[in-house]
């Protein structure tokens, strides 16, 4: 009896098939370093089982195998589609919610911008409709439906950098990333300026310049890329060194409110500051702006409050270590599987000689 792990990725099809999570780096080449380390810890907790974990990027229609012992792990479905196979597997772990979250945080947008965001939600909801109908049919037929558990998206950049004490960091705030990820001549290009990601990041960019003009003493390291793919193709070492060397991470939303940047910041005790954050991280130590226009005043005031800065920094490190660290998430997944009867807590057997 052996726990099996399979990769089913449209990004790296050459790596698809069974893989061994005995090494923490098992999914690095597939672009999933965080989840690979989670599976590394989970595998050690599970021991030998008859479970099969299928790791997929965003395929919600088919899996290479089905059964009550199959666990689907969906890592990149930002469109929050329902799976076609919820009645065919034992459990589903996914990195994004089950309903499109594009409208989160659009309270400050103009009506025309709300319309653009609403279009994206409606589009993605319709894309997920076939799966939702299949699940509804299964429920009507009283078939067993797999539970869904949301897990953090974690980090993408994972190179090792030296820790810099908070008071010794050179930059007050840092941002490196794209403003919009749409390709030229794509069907959605005309809607780019109405989409939540582009809108919020343009507002952030303007707020950065406003902050530097009003408070020239504030040091902000910023650079912009043409797309998300260009961002992840750039030097991870340089990106993480700058993140580590900053007190705040400017954290605008992406295509959805969830971003790698948020977790990469917490991991280093860098304080995320922004306007839109997913509901799943409520309670985490971040600074929420009412709108990006408030950045200048908020940042300058916080930088003067050294005690508050230290508290936020320490809380960020603690939150990562107790809520989002790879081993913590693995233990949470293991507990959920145990509650479902799909895994069993190991008990230590003590011999009479050991007791004596």
Task: Please describe what each predicted stretch is.
Residues 244-246, 265-270:
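Conserved donor-binding/catalytic loop of nucleotide-activated donor transferases
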Residues 248, 264, 301-304, 318:
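Short basic/hydrophobic patches in alpha-helices and adjacent helix-turn junctions
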Residues 1-260, 274-279, 283-284, 327, ...:
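Nucleotide-sugar donor-binding catalytic core of glycosyltransferases
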Residues 291-308:
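C-terminal "capping" alpha-helix adjacent to the active site of nucleotide-linked donor transferases
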Residues 349-350, 354-356:
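Extended, composition-driven regions rather than compact fold-specific motifs
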Residues 277-278, 283, 287, 292-295, ...:
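Catalytic cores of eukaryotic secretory-pathway lumenal/extracellular enzymes that build
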Residues 303-345:
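A charged, aromatic-enriched C-terminal amphipathic alpha-helix characteristic of glycosyltransferases
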């Amino acid at each position: 009896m052996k726990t099996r792990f399979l990769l089913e990725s449209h990004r790296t099809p050459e790596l698809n098939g069974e893989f061994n999570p005995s090494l923490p780096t098992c999914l690095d080449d597939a672009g999933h370093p965080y989840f690979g380390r989670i599976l590394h810890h989970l595998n050690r907790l599970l021991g030998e089982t008859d479970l099969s974990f299928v790791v997929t990027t965003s395929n919600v229609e088919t899996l290479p195998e089905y059964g009550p012992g199959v666990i689907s792990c969906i890592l990149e479905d930002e469109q929050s589609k329902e799976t076609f196979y919820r009645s065919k597997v034992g459990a589903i772990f996914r990195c994004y919610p089950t309903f499109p979250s594009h409208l989160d945080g659009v309270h400050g947008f103009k009506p025309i911008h709300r319309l653009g965001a609403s279009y994206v939600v409606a589009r993605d909801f319709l894309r997920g409709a076939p799966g939702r109908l299949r699940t509804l049919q299964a429920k009507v037929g009283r078939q067993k439906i797999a539970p869904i558990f949301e897990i953090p998206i974690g980090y993408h950049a994972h190179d090792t950098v030296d820790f810099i004490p908070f008071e010794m960091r050179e930059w007050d705030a840092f941002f490196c990333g794209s403003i919009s990820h749409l390709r030229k001549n794509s069907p959605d290009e005309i809607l780019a300026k109405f989409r939540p990601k582009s809108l919020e990041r343009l507002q952030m960019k303007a707020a950065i310049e406003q902050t530097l003009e009003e408070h020239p003493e504030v040091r902000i390291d910023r650079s912009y890329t043409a797309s998300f793919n260009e961002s992840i193709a750039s030097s991870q070492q340089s990106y993480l060194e700058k993140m580590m060397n900053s007190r705040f991470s400017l954290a605008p939303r992406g295509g959805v409110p969830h971003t790698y940047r948020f977790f990469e910041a917490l991991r280093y005790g860098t304080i995320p500051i922004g306007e839109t954050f997913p509901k799943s991280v409520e309670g985490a130590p971040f600074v929420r702006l009412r709108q990006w226009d408030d950045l200048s005043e908020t940042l300058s005031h916080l930088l003067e409050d050294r005690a508050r800065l230290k508290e936020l920094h320490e809380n960020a490190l603690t939150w990562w270590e107790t809520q989002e660290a790879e081993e913590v998430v693995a233990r949470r997944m293991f507990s959920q599987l145990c509650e479902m009867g799909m895994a069993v807590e190991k008990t230590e057997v003590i011999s009479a000689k050991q007791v004596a």
